[in-house]
């Protein structure tokens, strides 16, 4: 209030304000607003030449604006020694500064000391006059634009006044982002976006939420309640929006298309996520490990890795997860549910992303290519794993035995060796496994299923790895080479066996009792006395030379 009174007194002194009706100072002291003032310009000697205007003023900002208007409405030149106020004002101001005329533009560019040499008035002028804002009136620049109707203004104040046109009666506007709401309660909820307030806390796990409805949905995780059920397949969901998203799986509809590459999706969120593939910039960086992300939500999820927080626990096996979606996927291991089925071959999956990756087997699509060696993959994660082959990096180390891995999933699988835990049990024969994939493969023994068929000869296999090995027979490819002797093999296991033979010969070559047996192994591995004698047992001398004994006789 004191500041407003001081501003008003300075305004009266500098600009010349004649009060109509009640004295504004009295109004300010009584905390009444708005008040009405009649503003007059300073004129040269004759009060009769003064022009005036009347407007309603609101405190603070409009006093400043009105003062500017008064200053700008002065006559082009100021060539006077005495300035006086309009008739009716008892105060007379003597001006002994402006003995020389100044144009308006000169006044704007002149330093404050030239305009007001008195320290008191320099301070006042500095506070309430903004020359930069005034200049926009002459240049025609209108930097403040209305988002609703695209109308532009030279002053922010004018934009705020204009916005009231768009705000309907009985509407509530957010001061932070200007968003308008029909109800005050909706505005209150919206404000939590800016404040970060989360007043609704889960009594079960302590997790907090901004909205009560989100807490209600969250509680279903603990109760297991899923009120929204799909009529097509019977699958149930916590939230109605999840059911809506799920239904698209059955229709096959993909209305959301990427403008960059033409790829279509069945959900807008999937399209949004996909678009970040085209954006190389990753502005969101983890302070803990310097890993960067192209979405803030990804960074938020990543941070949980460092905190170790696992709020979502499996009731079946007690395993904890840091995301509800991960827990949902995990539960399918126990139930055996596989809702995502391939239309091409009938194979089913418990995760939609696995089905997407699987489909590329049929299409042959491999969009992810290694820049180092040119090898292509059907999934980005596989390319990431592959790249470690070139770097040799193994960041995931077992605390129990020190063994290192290039993937966290491999470390997780490895740890089960130490714990001896076998969660996955065959209902047919009771045999237990430490991996769900091993159980799935094992079940084919009972069912006789062999889903992997060779296109060349029609032979079928119960494992994809067996089919891969088999295909080499037709191609004749021998990619596994012995560094010691240069011999090549079509399977890594055959190379391993070959190496063991060499190691065994080095260890036992000086023992006469083992040389004859080793000779037979060497003959099978292809070591010969002379060309064209494949299959014959080599001489002991040849065995000794092969084993590195220097050819000494035994």
UniProtKB/Swiss-Prot annotation:
SUPFAM superfamilies (UniProt xref): beta-beta-alpha zinc fingers
One of the GO biological process terms: regulation of DNA-templated transcription
SMART domains associated with the record: KRAB, ZnF_C2H2
Main location: nucleus
Zinc finger map (C2H2-type): 116-138, 144-166, 172-194, 200-222, 228-250, 256-278, 284-306, 312-334, 340-362, 368-390, 396-418, 424-446, 452-474, 480-502
Keywords: DNA-binding, Metal-binding, Nucleus, Repeat, Transcription, Transcription regulation, Zinc, Zinc-finger
Subcellular location: Nucleus
Cysteines joined through disulfide linkages: none
GO cellular component: nucleus
Matching Pfam families: zf-C2H2 (PF00096), zf-H2C2_2 (PF13465)
Keyword Nucleotidyltransferase (UniProt): no
Domain KRAB residues, every copy: 1-47
One MF term in the entry's GO annotations: RNA polymerase II cis-regulatory region sequence-specific DNA binding
Function noted in UniProt: May be involved in transcriptional regulation.
Family of the protein in this entry: Belongs to the krueppel C2H2-type zinc-finger protein family.
Protein name: Zinc finger protein 714
Species of the source: Homo sapiens (Human)
Gene: ZNF714
């Amino acid at each position: 209030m004191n500041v407003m009174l001081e501003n008003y007194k300075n305004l009266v002194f500098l600009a010349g304000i004649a009060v109509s009706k009640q004295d504004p100072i009295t109004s300010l002291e009584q905390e009444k607003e708005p008040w009405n003032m009649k503003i007059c310009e300073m004129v040269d000697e004759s009060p009769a030449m003064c022009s005036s205007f009347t407007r309603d003023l609101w405190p603070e900002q409009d006093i400043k604006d009105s003062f500017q208007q008064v200053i700008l409405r002065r006559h082009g030149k100021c060539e006077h020694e005495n300035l006086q106020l309009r008739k009716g004002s008892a105060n007379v101001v003597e001006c002994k500064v402006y003995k020389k005329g100044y144009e308006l533009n000169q006044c704007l560019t002149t330093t404050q000391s030239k305009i007001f040499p008195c320290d008191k008035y320099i301070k006042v002028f500095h506070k309430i006059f903004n020359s930069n804002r005034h200049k926009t009136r002459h240049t025609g620049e209108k930097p403040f634009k209305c988002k609703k109707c695209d109308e532009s203004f030279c002053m922010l104040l004018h934009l705020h006044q204009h916005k009231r046109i768009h705000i309907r009666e009985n509407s509530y506007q957010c001061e932070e982002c200007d968003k308008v709401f029909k109800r005050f309660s909706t505005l209150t909820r919206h404000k939590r976006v800016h404040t970060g307030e989360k007043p609704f806390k889960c009594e079960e796990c302590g997790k907090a939420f901004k909205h009560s409805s989100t807490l209600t949905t969250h509680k279903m995780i603990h109760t297991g309640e899923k009120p929204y059920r799909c009529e097509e397949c019977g699958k149930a969901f916590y939230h109605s929006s999840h059911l809506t998203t799920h239904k698209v799986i059955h229709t096959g509809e993909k209305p959301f298309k990427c403008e960059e590459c033409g790829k279509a999706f069945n959900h807008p969120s999937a399209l949004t996520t996909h678009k970040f593939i085209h954006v190389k910039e990753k502005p969101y960086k983890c302070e803990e490990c310097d890993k960067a992300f192209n979405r803030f939500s990804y960074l938020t999820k990543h941070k949980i890795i460092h905190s170790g927080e696992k709020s979502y626990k499996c009731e079946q096996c007690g395993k904890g997860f840091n995301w509800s979606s991960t827990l949902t996927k995990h539960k399918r291991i126990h139930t055996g549910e596989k809702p995502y089925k391939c239309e091409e071959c009938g194979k089913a999956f418990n995760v939609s992303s696995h089905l997407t990756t699987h489909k590329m087997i049929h299409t042959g699509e491999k969009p992810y290519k290694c820049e180092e060696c040119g090898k292509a993959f059907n999934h980005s994660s596989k390319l990431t794993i592959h790249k470690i082959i070139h770097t040799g990096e193994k960041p995931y180390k077992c605390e129990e035995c020190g063994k290192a891995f290039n993937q966290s999933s491999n470390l997780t699988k490895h740890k089960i060796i130490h714990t001896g835990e076998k969660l996955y049990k065959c209902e047919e024969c009771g045999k237990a496994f430490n991996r769900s994939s091993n159980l799935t493969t094992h079940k084919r023994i009972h069912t006789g299923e062999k889903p992997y068929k060779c296109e060349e000869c029609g032979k079928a296999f119960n494992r994809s790895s067996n089919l891969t090995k088999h295909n080499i027979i037709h191609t004749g490819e021998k990619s596994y080479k012995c560094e010691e002797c240069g011999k090549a093999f079509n399977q890594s296991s055959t190379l391993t066996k070959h190496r063991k033979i060499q190691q065994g010969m080095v260890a036992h070559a000086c023992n006469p009792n083992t040389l004859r047996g080793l000779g037979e192994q060497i003959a099978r591995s292809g070591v010969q006395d002379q060309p064209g004698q494949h299959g014959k047992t080599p001489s002991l001398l040849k065995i000794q030379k092969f084993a590195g004994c220097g050819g000494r006789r035994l």
